[in-house]
Amino acid sequence: MIITTTGIIEGKPIRQYFGLVNGEAIMGANVVRDIFASITDIVGGRSGAYESKLAHAREIALEEMTEQARRMGANAIVGVDLDYEVIREGMLMVSASGTAVQI
């Protein structure tokens, strides 16, 4: 499965559009609290624990989106957008969306 943020895949014409696909992952309050509790992990202004949790949430959102596209018969997703939203106190949502296509 090819996944790209661009609207086209150079050298590979889009033969069919299937529509919007998306995936979400929500990090619960305990995860966020645990991340900030491990503030000693911060080196050079970056928190390895926080980045790891964000990467895992992003991976889950992309996997959900990819699986939805596969079920539609797509072999690529174009125009992918990743969003990070704080929802409620201490909860973070990562969402991925794009257009499922056949190339």
Swiss-Prot record:
This is UPF0145 protein Dred_2155. It comes from the Bacteria. Signal peptide: none annotated. Belongs to the UPF0145 family. HAMAP family: UPF0145. InterPro entries: UPF0145_dom_sf, UPF0145_YbjQ-like. It comes from Desulforamulus reducens (strain ATCC BAA-1160 / DSM 100696 / MI-1) (Desulfotomaculum reducens). SUPFAM superfamilies: YbjQ-like (SSF117782). Disulfide bonds: none annotated.
